Every structure is written in structure tokens, then in C-alpha cells.
Amino acid sequence: MDMNGKAAIVTGGASGLGAAAARMLANKGAKVAILDLNEDLGETVAKELDGYFVTCDVTNEQSVQEGLEAATNVHDCARILVNCAGIGNAARMVGKNGAHDFGLFSKIITVNLIGTFNVTRLFAVSTTQLDPLEDDERGVIIMTASVAAFDGQIGQAAYSASKGGIHSMTLPIAREFANRGVRVCTIAPGVLKTPLLDILPEEVQKSLGESIPFPQRLGHAEEFASLAMHILENRYLNGETIRLDGALRMAAK
């Protein structure tokens, strides 16, 4: 898909992977709307991109519906969706204080998996009805999983389950939307340098980078964004989860 002039939605676009994707979309000429809970950062990124920001809770149907409608009123109906909203708390099944907190497990599943599903289904209602472009393509949906979906570590039961769910629903959604001209792909990042990782001590970040086979460093958010752009531009990519991890296979802990 040629992104120039196309409307795009990026959830979690106020920082990290989402912000990098939003910036690269804007550089390609897309009209970007950021949906995020962080108003200060979201407004800042949107202003930088001459885009649009909407405060949005991806787990709430009304919030997402209103966010998509607001973005449509400003930029027209979007053909591009990049789902980056998510959280990543770690906890053991049985820790020092007893069993894994059930509320924490539910929250991670709700934000990461159900939130992605919620935005995707509501986005698709209008996008599947747009006029087709080249190859009868109407839109592209990109979701964000994690290598934890495949080799989760101790303490990642909830996170791995949430990201594994995103991976598992990629193909069924792509198959459903095939006759409507909407492609669906998922990116499964490894250890990328994001604000969440920046809070770790420098020596820990260095050690993490050295654990990557090649290139032996942390990944960059811009590399995630670059892969997202390739997915958008390559019309034969569909129904696939792509690992972006420098050949990393995570150890148990």
C-alpha cells in the first residue's frame, strides 16, 4: 500500500514502538491519528507529526468507537491500523506472597489481547467497506505480539498468554478478511530499546544486548517501525507473525 495521503491509526502511539511507527508513517505521507491514554506524550507526538491525538482506552468499546469516529472526522476513514498499546508486568505463578495475583493476570490479558481484538474489530467495520485499491486491497492491520509468545520466561505466564493470543488470532482474522481486501500481520519483537527498558540499569541493558546472537545489541524502535512499513508496502505479506529478534531464543530466566 502506498501510504501517502492515507489515514492511519496507531494505538499506543504516544511512546516506544507506537511513536516510532507513527513517525515513520508520517514520513511516508500518511495522516496519523494516535490513540493512547497518555495525553501529554500523545499530544506532543501528534503535534510533531502534524497529526491528531485522541485519548483512548483500548479495553473500552465506547472509548475506542469514539476515538475512531473522531479520527475519521479529521482524517477520513483509516486504511491502516498499527496496534501497539500494551503492558508488560512480570509475576511468578507462586511468589513470596502466594499465588499470582488474579487481577494482574486479568489486566494484562485485557489490555494486551482483548484491547488489540477490540480495536481491530471496530476498525475493520468501516475499513472493509472502503473502495478497493491496487490488488483489491482496502486496508492493512498490524498487531504487536512478542517473542514471549513462543519462548516465554519464568514470570511471564500472563504476558506470554496475552501475546500468544495475538499470534494465534492473526491467521483466522487474515482468512476472514481475505475476501474483503484487508491484510493482517503481526510483529513479534525481541528485546528492543524502549522507555520500558530504559528504566533498567545500564549494565543490565548491556548484558541483554550481549545475549542477542546477531547483531549483538538491543533492537531499536525504528527497526520495528521499518518492518511495519515493509508489511504495509508488501501486498503479498498476509496472515503471518514475523519475529524481530536478532535470532534470540530466550532462556527460562
Predicted segments with their positions:
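Canonical Rossmann dinucleotide-binding motif of NAD(H)/NADP(H)-dependent dehydrogenases/reductases
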Residues: D2-A33
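Conserved mid-core segment of classical short-chain dehydrogenase/reductases
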Residues: G88-S106, V125, Q129-D135, G155-A158, ...
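Active-site helix of classical SDR
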Residues: T120, S162, T170
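Short, small/polar-rich loop/turn modules that mediate ligand/substrate recognition or access, typified
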Residues: A178, R183, L237-E240
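Catalytic Tyr-X3-Lys loop
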Residues: I87, G98-N118, I142, Y159, ...
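Residue(s) in the substrate-gating loop at a strand-loop-helix junction
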Residues: S146
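Alpha-helical segment proximal to the catalytic Tyr-Lys
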Residues: V125, A174-E176
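C-terminal substrate-recognition "lid" of short-chain dehydrogenase/reductases
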Residues: H220-L244, R249
